[in-house]
């Protein structure tokens, strides 16, 4: 006999619905008006390994290395205060204008080259690739002068908010955990904003070397007291609104050139079950098992360049399809294929000695970089419905403040006092304090500011990137100036005479 019974399994309840993230194409209307904007030649020069502080009358020399991030903060004009070719383009009562980045080209000057980095006191115990007998790990200074050609990187990230980077740093120790001096600290993956001048991953890992390497000699001197960051592609790709990364270009390559081990007491001893004890000196106890490799970026070539090329943004990887919120754009660049360091020598003695005497000369090293930024912006408009304004306010409330949206108070009919002289001791102190200027949310971060507020042009055919865009988009050039040549009166009269004769 069949008997029906209820299911013993748990009842499935659907998840609570969440608010849907809207793509910018759903509430942004693109117009057919395009503008070109380009920077001037952007130059920077300094010492490739460290900054030199002020000493006496000498000015400070900054640290400028090819292994630093260049984060350009591009300031754009407010399109709502822009002189438009068509005044009937939008209704300022119900609409607002924004910029959309549709084309970009990052130009790089200077020749291709490889710049070395290193440390005059590098912690190198043994050459573990070609070693015959291990060196006894005694309390002797085995540091040596070692130079390397770092990992080769080309990178370009475009977004309207600063890029994010990740690195390993010291984590938090639990309260119930007992630690002793010299123990390995817990590690934590830290995500932070990438600033201009931050060091990239040069092949030794993305970590806080200041806090995690007490010897100050395990890596080259340009990163021994720095934090190397690697772009947090996973977090930027998962950004809710897609503002930090519209798209990115990346090319990395390296190989291991030399293999060393580190001098010092090994914190985590090798278990005796993993080897058979030796008898000779250097084999019992075993020497250092802390191995590391020096990176090499290998050959640089013009066939694998990401820069000096135009890129067109048709569809961004996130929900923001190139809209420049806040009238700003962040361009993050790395290019180690032009890392040549300039060596400069000066005569310090009264005259040059013969034969050659090295102490008569001083040696200096500098590194210079050259950039140029070019953009194509499309003018767009947003219809300010209730849903759109609520969505933008949830994303970034300062956008509506920049659009001058707020509560308008009704005019008052009461009589108010207005003093003529207010900044003197005879007049009572005024209650109304001066308005506080708007705080920049990124003022505590360091960026390379590029002002393009007065460098917009609608004549695309006057600029190289503009002509490339017109060819790509199929836009016709404007007709040439001038009037058509009128037909001469003599030719017309002679034609009439010929017609009469034929009759």
Swiss-Prot record:
Gene Ontology molecular function terms on file: structural molecule activity
Cellular component terms per the entry's GO annotation: host cell nucleus; T=7 icosahedral viral capsid
Pfam families associated with the record: Late_protein_L1 (PF00500)
Residue ranges, annotated region (Disordered): 476-503
Keyword Ribonucleoprotein annotated: no
Annotated signal sequence range: none
Residue spans of biased composition, Basic residues class: 494-503
Biased composition (Low complexity): 484-493
Protein's UniProt name: Major capsid protein L1
Oligomer and partners: Self-assembles into homopentamers. The capsid has an icosahedral symmetry and consists of 72 capsomers, with each capsomer being a pentamer of L1. Interacts with the minor capsid protein L2; this interaction is necessary for viral genome encapsidation. Interacts with protein E2; this interaction enhances E2-dependent replication and transcription activation.
Family indicated by similarity: Belongs to the papillomaviridae L1 protein family.
GO biological process, one term: virion attachment to host cell
Keywords of the record: Capsid protein, Disulfide bond, Host nucleus, Host-virus interaction, Late protein, T=7 icosahedral capsid protein, Viral attachment to host cell, Viral penetration into host cytoplasm, Virion, Virus endocytosis by host, Virus entry into host cell
Keyword Signal among record annotations: no
Cell compartments where the protein resides: Virion; Host nucleus
Function: Forms an icosahedral capsid with a T=7 symmetry and a 50 nm diameter. The capsid is composed of 72 pentamers linked to each other by disulfide bonds and associated with L2 proteins. Binds to heparan sulfate proteoglycans on cell surface of basal layer keratinocytes to provide initial virion attachment. This binding mediates a conformational change in the virus capsid that facilitates efficient infection. The virion enters the host cell via endocytosis. During virus trafficking, L1 protein dissociates from the viral DNA and the genomic DNA is released to the host nucleus.
